[in-house]
Amino acid sequence: MKFDVLILGGGVSGMQCALVLGSGLSKPFAINKKAGIIIHQRASQLQNALFNNVLGLPPGKFGSDILIEGKKQLAALYPEVAQIEKEKVIAVENDKEGYQITTNKNTYFSKTVVIALNYAKPFSIKGLESFVIPHKKANPIKERIQLINKDHLIQKGLYCCGTIAGCRSQFAIAAGSGASVATDILTLWNNGNHTKVHDKKPIF
């Protein structure tokens, strides 16, 4: 299966990236673009999280509920974004048209890839080993890792977002990181014209 963009990871940053990309697929410059997300949430930091300090979330919100609700929201609003579940990414390797993504079940090809996995060890995805460094904004005792990047870009067509991009483990920061990458990709598709996607309240 071939994609124009494939997101790897279904946590905060990955799902937020998918939602913003999905909202942009109806734009003229994104017509016929194919987007997908490989959702492997079992290792997500959200599983045991409780939120009281996130704008827009009611106090006492469980991270495990957000994981479920995020998938439902993406499917309901932007069904064009393919959700691939119960697959674990094994390799991300250069391909003549972008990247080949290998999971424990399938092989995919994408022009652009977004790494949105968590920052815990071990990180054993083949093809990304040379980009792994100690996390710059985490407690060294925990031995967290990140991928070398400049403003989320690792190299042409390869992005990262959230904690794996070097962000602190904070919900709002991770979400913003994912949204930032999505708008960078939409901008790229829009011939470099800076792009964002806003919905507006209807006026009666």
Model features per residue range: what roles?
Residues 130, 136-159, 166:
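FAD-binding beta-loop-beta segment adjacent to the flavin cofactor pocket
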Residues 6-8, 107-121, 158:
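Short hydrophobic core segments
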Residues 1-4, 66-68, 73, 135-139, ...:
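Extreme N-terminal leader/targeting segments of oxidoreductases
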